[in-house]
């Protein structure tokens, strides 16, 4: 299964206290912690997942998705993510971070 890693592409680092961090999602400011739901649903089900790059946002920051596999199929999940990353052109470093 392929699903979001987070509700937004990569974002600039925020060094404020965790409880003070926010992100814009569809132009609505939301607590950063809410974004962990995407990863949390998978982790709480004890399913293996592997995040892979899919390109860069309009801001030039990485966009990623997560591949999710059946229980105890970690290697299959990793291999799938490797293959799809290869098909999509591999990881591209953002120009602001060469």
PLM regions: where:
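Structural helix-boundary/capping segments
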Residues: 31, 43-98
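Serine-dependent amide/ester hydrolase catalytic core
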Residues: 1-44, 95-97
């Amino acid at each position: 299964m392929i699903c979001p890693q987070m509700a937004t592409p990569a974002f600039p680092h925020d060094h404020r206290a965790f409880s003070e961090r926010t992100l814009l999602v569809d132009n609505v400011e939301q607590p950063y912690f809410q974004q962990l739901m995407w990863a949390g649903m998978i982790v709480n089900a004890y399913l293996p997942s592997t995040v892979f790059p899919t390109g860069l946002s309009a801001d030039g920051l990485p966009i990623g998705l997560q591949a999710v596999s059946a229980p105890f199929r970690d290697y299959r999940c990793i291999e799938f993510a490797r293959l799809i990353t290869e098909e999509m052109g591999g990881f591209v470093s953002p120009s602001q971070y060469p």
